[in-house]
């Protein structure tokens, strides 16, 4: 989502899927691999740089992880703050925060869920754009080389380069993304899947619009991955400005059409896609129907879509947040009805994601 606001391979899902186990990490499946059907568990990106754990920010609790695993989610997108993980550019990662990250990853792994690492920084470090004099591309590459080494070639961990690059020229962002990817493949020696956003908050609706220079759909076609293991990440909301900050679904049809258009772009260029954020208010039938329509686009086109992660849930999200699907004392949130058909699809076809195999 914009700065204005703020699966898990569960046992039943893995039946018939051969997994080679190594310690607490499960390796790539030797049989079919399901698409990502996940949830954003938000909290570690809260507050300002620094801050005190469990006062200013938090990592997902066991209770929250277990709940979403029990519902059939098989992936967690895990937002965190770059500045906390690396307080000084070009310097080692903070040992304490790395420890908290590792604990969160193991908590999620214990439920056989996959993890998407998400530096939730909008292409900034301490307010300065990546690719600027104060945050050069080399610093972004250094950060990713250090982070990728922690989970190099552990294929249940996916590297999301950056959350929603915003107000940054597309040429500047493309250079930074290419350098970070080169560092992941080179310095870290990691072959993990990389998720690559565009600029302009990586909206599917604006993928072909020239907002910060060339359209994402033109410039990002020049993205370079020496490992050739990446997918383009887009976000899409349903409200009047597609920000996900309004309590309406007035652009539902346009949002679904945007995903369909992005699907055509993926197929035309031979690329893969990932829907990293999408969500809807739970109190309106139209919104729930539109939410299902968005999921259906990805589920019906698994040759190019690697999956999705819903926004949002997390231990500290208020019950009044319209998009929040953290359970309340009354039980499950209404939005789960739109996600359930995909989460409960245990058929052979449902467990097979051609774009990941």
Where are these regions (language model features)?
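N-terminal signal peptide c-region/cleavage motif recognized by signal peptidases
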Residues: 22-24
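Active-site mouth of glycoside hydrolases
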Residues: 32-210, 215-217
């Amino acid at each position: 989502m914009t700065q204005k606001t703020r699966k898990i391979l569960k046992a039943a899902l893995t039946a018939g899927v051969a997994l080679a186990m190594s310690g607490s990490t499960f390796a790539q499946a030797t049989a079919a691999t399901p698409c990502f059907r996940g949830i954003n568990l938000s909290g570690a990106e809260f507050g300002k740089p620094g801050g005190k754990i469990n006062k200013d920010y938090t990592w997902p609790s066991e209770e929250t992880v277990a709940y979403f695993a029990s519902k059939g989610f098989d992936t967690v997108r895990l937002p965190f703050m770059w500045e906390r993980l690396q307080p000084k550019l070009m310097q080692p990662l903070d040992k304490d925060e790395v420890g908290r990250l590792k604990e969160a990853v193991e908590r999620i792994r214990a439920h056989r869920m996959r993890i998407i690492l998400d530096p939730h920084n909008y292409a900034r470090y301490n307010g300065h754009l990546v690719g600027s004099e104060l945050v050069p591309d080399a610093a972004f590459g250094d950060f990713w080389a250090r982070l990728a080494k922690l989970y190099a070639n552990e294929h249940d961990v996916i590297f999301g380069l950056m959350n929603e690059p915003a107000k940054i020229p597309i040429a500047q962002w493309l250079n930074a993304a290419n350098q970070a990817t080169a560092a992941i493949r080179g310095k870290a020696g990691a072959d993990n899947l990389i998720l690559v956003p565009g600029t302009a908050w990586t909206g599917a609706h604006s993928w072909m619009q020239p907002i910060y220079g060339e359209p994402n759909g033109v410039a990002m076609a020049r993205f370079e991955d020496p490992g050739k293991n990446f997918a383009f990440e887009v976000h899409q909301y349903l409200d009047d400005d597609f920000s996900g900050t309004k309590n309406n679904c007035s652009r539902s049809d346009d949002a679904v059409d945007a995903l369909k258009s992005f699907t055509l772009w993926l197929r035309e260029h031979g690329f893969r896609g990932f829907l990293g954020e999408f969500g809807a208010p739970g109190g309106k039938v139209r919104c729930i129907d539109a939410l299902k329509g968005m999921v259906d686009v990805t589920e019906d086109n698994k040759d190019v879509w690697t999956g999705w992660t819903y926004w949002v849930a997390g231990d500290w999200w208020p019950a009044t947040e319209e998009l929040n699907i953290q359970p309340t004392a009354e039980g499950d949130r209404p939005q789960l009805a739109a996600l359930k058909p995909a989460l409960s699809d245990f058929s052979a076809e449902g467990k097979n994601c051609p774009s990941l195999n």
